[in-house]
């Protein structure tokens, strides 16, 4: 993301926090996902009394984008209200993000200070489509060897 895109995404992520549904944790998270063609999709965390049904802000943004046909991303910005530390995506959101490639992940505090990383750096040893392709190719080779 260039600086102008980053600033727009920070604005969008921080502004979206007001819509978070977090009656249990009171921990508002906003996300802004930038597509390769410059469109921004926002997301917020949506909690549920059955905690396992809660969805994070990042996955909300990803599903909004994908449901409208976007699958190529430049970056995602994740905003929280914590002043003393950066909040990074949870493990599920990290795995969800790498499905769409290696792109920038920016975590932002209320004062707009940032921590920058990438989907691949945040999930070392990641499991991806390449692993599934490698397994299919291995199975095909083994099948041919048996015939």
Curated annotation (Swiss-Prot):
- Catalytic center at which residues? 58
What's the cofactor?
Zn(2+)
Q: What is the protein's name according to its record?
A: Probable cytidine deaminase
**Its Gene Ontology biological processes?**
cytidine catabolic process; cytidine deamination; deoxycytidine catabolic process; pyrimidine-containing compound salvage
Q: What InterPro entries does this protein's entry cite?
A: CMP_dCMP_dom (IPR002125), Cyt/Deoxycyt_deaminase (IPR050202), Cyt_deam_tetra (IPR006262), Cytidine_deaminase-like (IPR016193)
Which positions are annotated as binding substrate? 45-51
Q: Pfam families under this entry?
A: dCMP_cyt_deam_1 (PF00383)
Q: Does the keyword Nuclease apply?
A: no
One annotated Gene Ontology cellular component of this protein? nucleus
The catalytic activity of this protein is classed by the Enzyme Commission as 3.5.4.5
| Domain CMP/dCMP-type deaminase residue range list | 4-130
Record flagged with keyword Transmembrane: no
Q: Which UniProt keywords apply?
A: Hydrolase, Metal-binding, Zinc
Detail which positions bind Zn(2+). Answer: 56, 90, 93
A GO MF term: zinc ion binding
Q: Which family does it belong to?
A: Belongs to the cytidine and deoxycytidylate deaminase family.
Upper classification of the source organism reads: Eukaryota, Amoebozoa, Evosea, Eumycetozoa, Dictyostelia
Q: What does this protein do?
A: This enzyme scavenges exogenous and endogenous cytidine and 2'-deoxycytidine for UMP synthesis.
Q: Which reaction does it catalyse?
A: cytidine + H2O + H(+) = uridine + NH4(+); 2'-deoxycytidine + H2O + H(+) = 2'-deoxyuridine + NH4(+)
């Amino acid at each position: 993301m260039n600086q102008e895109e980053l600033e727009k995404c920070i604005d969008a992520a921080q502004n979206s926090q007001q819509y978070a549904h977090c009656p249990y944790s009171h921990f508002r998270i906003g996300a802004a996902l930038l597509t390769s063609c410059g469109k921004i999709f926002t997301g917020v965390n949506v909690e549920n009394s059955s905690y396992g049904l809660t969805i994070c802000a990042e996955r909300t943004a990803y599903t909004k984008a994908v449901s409208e046909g976007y699958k190529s991303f430049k970056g995602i910005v994740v905003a929280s209200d914590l002043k003393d530390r950066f909040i990074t995506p949870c493990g599920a959101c990290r795995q969800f993000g790498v499905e769409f490639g290696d792109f920038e992940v920016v975590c932002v505090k209320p004062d707009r200070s940032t921590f920058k990383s990438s989907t691949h750096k945040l999930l070392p040893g990641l499991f991806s489509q390449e692993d599934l392709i490698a397994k299919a190719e291995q199975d095909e080779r083994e099948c041919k060897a048996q015939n």
